Amino acid sequence: MSIIPVTRVQRTTLIAILSAISFGLMLFPQVPIIPSADFLKLDFSIVPVVIGLYWLNYSASLWVILIRTLLKLILANEGVNTYLGLPVNLLVVLAFITVLKITMPNLEQYSNWQKKILPLISSTFVMTIVAIVINWFVAIPLYARFANFDIAKFIGLKNYFIGMVLPFNLIEGIIWFVVSMIILRAIQPLQRRFHS
């Protein structure tokens, strides 16, 4: 059941808690899933964002994304990698969440996994396209200029996109979706208590 808290205090408190958890999950665990691209790491910071999406609403999930991104920038800044990688991550997460909200506006009507196939495929596909486009036009040129890491020269664009970016984001999107749905199901009792 989609839940909107009855008070502003509840809403603000939950957004703060989810943002803090999401920030923590940006730092640990970080899992490389493509052997040839260990610099591309999966994290689970999306899960609290999805909780905010379905416990509260879309705008709440955007607040969680914004706050955890600012926390990362302020408290765990790694220099150039953060300045260049964080915007890419932000846009990919926004794409995933937006498509998820459009294709699966509430959980009540998508109670079984068969009904979740379209949202899974759609959100994963769109976030992958966004990741490819942002990497191509923004991240790669900026990394070459500011981090002295020319991907086209050291890895090759074909190898980078087909062998790294494409499979990484497809796997990441599937894992994000499946883990988020499992967690949402597991914490349903907390959801009811939060609303009571």
Swiss-Prot record:
Subunit annotation: In E.coli forms a stable energy-coupling factor (ECF) transporter complex probably composed of a membrane-embedded substrate-binding protein (S component), 2 ATP-binding proteins (A components) and 2 transmembrane proteins (T component). May be able to interact with more than 1 S component at a time.
Protein name per the record: Riboflavin transporter RibU
PANTHER family: RIBOFLAVIN TRANSPORTER RIBU
Highest taxon listed in the record's lineage: Bacteria
Membrane topology: Multi-pass membrane protein
Function text: Probable riboflavin-binding protein that interacts with the energy-coupling factor (ECF) ABC-transporter complex. Unlike classic ABC transporters this ECF transporter provides the energy necessary to transport a number of different substrates. The substrates themselves are bound by transmembrane, not extracytoplasmic soluble proteins and transport it into cells.
Domain free text: Riboflavin is stacked with one or more Trp residues in the binding pocket of RibU.
UniProt GO MF annotations: riboflavin transmembrane transporter activity
Entry keyword annotation includes RNA-binding: no
InterPro entries: ECF_trnsprt_substrate-spec (IPR024529), RibU (IPR025720)
Keywords (A to Z) from UniProt: Cell membrane, Membrane, Transmembrane, Transmembrane helix, Transport
Organism, as annotated: Leuconostoc mesenteroides subsp. mesenteroides (strain ATCC 8293 / DSM 20343 / BCRC 11652 / CCM 1803 / JCM 6124 / NCDO 523 / NBRC 100496 / NCIMB 8023 / NCTC 12954 / NRRL B-1118 / 37Y)
Taxonomy of the source species: Bacteria, Bacillati, Bacillota, Bacilli, Lactobacillales
Main location as per UniProt: membrane
Transmembrane segments annotated in the record for this chain: 14-34, 46-66, 80-100, 120-140, 164-184
Gene this protein is translated from: ribU
Keyword Transmembrane applies: yes
UniProt family annotation: Belongs to the prokaryotic riboflavin transporter (P-RFT) (TC 2.A.87) family.
GO cellular component: plasma membrane
Localization per record: Cell membrane
